């Protein structure tokens, strides 16, 4: 049994629910057992609704489902942690929700970095711990496999309390879902079970299901889960990532190329996918805008080789226009984050979905062809881009 409820916010726990942050015991808290059954079918919320994050590139091109599961793919240093912290911040401000972050078999240094950065960006409020927005549960690489295998369940139990008892929207982060499978494989070997494909445990599907099926929307509230997925040797057909994909509703892929260009969040607009991007779910307007953005960016990608060697002058007039708009779109997909204010010096922006769609609807047909592309870089909505353009002209 582990402590649950408001008293867990701002604290760090191990797999047994013991605080490990040297801030003393958790005060008068309720406890829940970590082994619980998934909600019954009758309790599930079957309505498909979008979970607005306030991050333009995510909401427009690969929207998250309320109570869905999202896979987060990206190497080291492309902004996974910052994206996770921005989501924690936005769910607290826009949805009045809370977050639980489970560190499953990752480096202790990364857990420490996340803790320090959450304190720096005020996601964990050191002065008044009760105002914190996240509870952290860690079972890192140095722990025995049993702890790493169960820490995901500890985190989801804490999230379930906020959903079922407090009736709130909860974000559950799991970093890294692959390590959960890896720990299960180690335990399976220790128990002397016959391994299945690629040496994984024979119970791989059941184990993954027992964790994933608990992460869902009920009529009371929702748990939306964002899971970092490590792909061993970049092989997507490996049983561990392949089993994970079966449960995901959306994928957010972070690109090193975009990070190198200075476009943050470095979410790849063409590689990120979502089952929610259907006209009967998001509406025709959103769907058409998203497809238009993707087509423009895809054409720009195809023209890159020509631009790299003979140069822009060799392109047709139409293609040159496409390139100019694609570069505007690429920059408009960036935005300043609240949690990165400390580093960038520019205030964070939360952009609602209708504002996001409106902005891209103006760029696509060429209404803003007269704006310099720099004006749409690191701004919130399209009005700010116009204001920035005016400021650039006045200054220039």
Swiss-Prot record:
Its EC number is 7.1.2.2. GO terms for biological process: proton motive force-driven mitochondrial ATP synthesis. It holds the Pfam family ATP-synt_ab. InterPro entries: AAA+_ATPase (IPR003593), ATP-synt_VA_C (IPR055190), ATP_synth_F1_bsu (IPR005722), ATPase_a/bsu_AS (IPR020003), ATPase_alpha/beta_chains (IPR050053), ATPase_F1/V1/A1_a/bsu_nucl-bd (IPR000194), ATPase_F1/V1_b/a_C (IPR024034), P-loop_NTPase (IPR027417). Keywords: ATP synthesis, ATP-binding, CF(1), Chloroplast, Hydrogen ion transport, Ion transport, Membrane, Nucleotide-binding, Plastid, Thylakoid, Translocase, Transport. One of its GO terms (molecular function) is proton-transporting ATP synthase activity, rotational mechanism. It catalyses: ATP + H2O + 4 H(+)(in) = ADP + phosphate + 5 H(+)(out). The keyword Repeat does not apply. The keyword Acetylation does not apply. Its main location: plastid. It is found in: Plastid, Chloroplast thylakoid membrane. CDD domains: ATP-synt_F1_beta_C, F1-ATPase_beta_CD. ATP binds at residues 74-81. GO terms for cellular component: chloroplast thylakoid membrane; mitochondrion; proton-transporting ATP synthase complex. It is a peripheral membrane protein. Produces ATP from ADP in the presence of a proton gradient across the membrane. The catalytic sites are hosted primarily by the beta subunits. Belongs to the ATPase alpha/beta chains family. F-type ATPases have 2 components, CF(1) - the catalytic core - and CF(0) - the membrane proton channel. CF(1) has five subunits: alpha(3), beta(3), gamma(1), delta(1), epsilon(1). CF(0) has four main subunits: a(1), b(1), b'(1) and c(9-12). This is ATP synthase subunit beta, chloroplastic.
């Amino acid at each position: 049994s582990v402590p649950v409820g408001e008293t867990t916010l701002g604290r760090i726990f191990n797999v047994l629910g013991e605080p490990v942050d040297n801030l003393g015991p958790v005060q008068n808290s309720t406890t829940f057992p970590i082994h619980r059954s998934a909600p019954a079918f009758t309790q599930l919320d079957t309505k498909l609704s979008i979970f607005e994050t306030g991050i333009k590139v995510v909401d427009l091109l690969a929207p998250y489902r309320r109570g869905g599961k999202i896979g987060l793919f990206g190497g080291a240093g492309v902004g996974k942690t910052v994206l996770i912290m921005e989501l924690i911040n936005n769910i607290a401000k826009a949805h009045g929700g809370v977050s639980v972050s489970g560190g499953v078999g990752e480096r202790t240094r990364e857990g420490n970095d996340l803790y320090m950065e959450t304190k720096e960006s005020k996601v964990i409020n050191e002065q008044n711990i009760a105002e914190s927005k996240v509870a952290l549960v860690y079972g890192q690489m140095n722990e025995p496999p049993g702890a790493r295998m169960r820490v995901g369940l500890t985190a989801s139990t804490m999230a379930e309390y906020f959903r079922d008892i407090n009736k709130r929207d909860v974000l559950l982060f799991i970093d890294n879902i692959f390590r959960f499978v890896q720990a299960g494989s180690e335990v399976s070997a220790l128990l002397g079970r016959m391994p299945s494909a690629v040496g994984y445990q024979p119970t791989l599907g059941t184990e993954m299901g027992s964790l994933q099926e608990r992460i869902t929307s009920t009529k009371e509230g929702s748990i939306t889960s964002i899971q970092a997925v490590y792909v061993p040797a970049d092989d997507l057909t490996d049983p561990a990532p392949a089993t994970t994909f079966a449960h995901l509703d959306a994928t957010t892929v972070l690109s090193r190329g975009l990070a190198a260009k200075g476009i943050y969040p470095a979410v790849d607009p063409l590689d990120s996918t979502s089952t929610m991007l259907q006209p009967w779910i998001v509406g025709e307007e959103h769907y058409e805008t998203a497809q238009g953005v993707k087509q423009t960016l895809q054409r720009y990608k195809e023209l890159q080789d020509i631009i790299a060697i003979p140069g822009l002058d060799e392109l047709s007039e139409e293609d040159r226009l496409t390139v100019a708009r694609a570069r505007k779109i690429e920059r408009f997909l960036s935005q300043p984050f609240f949690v990165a204010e400390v580093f960038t010096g520019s205030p964070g922006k939360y952009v609602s979905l209708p504002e996001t769609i409106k902005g891209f609807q103006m760029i696509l047909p060429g209404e803003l062809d007269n704006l310099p592309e720099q004006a749409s870089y690191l701004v919130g909505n399209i009005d700010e881009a116009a204001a920035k353009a005016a400021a650039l002209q006045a200054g220039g």
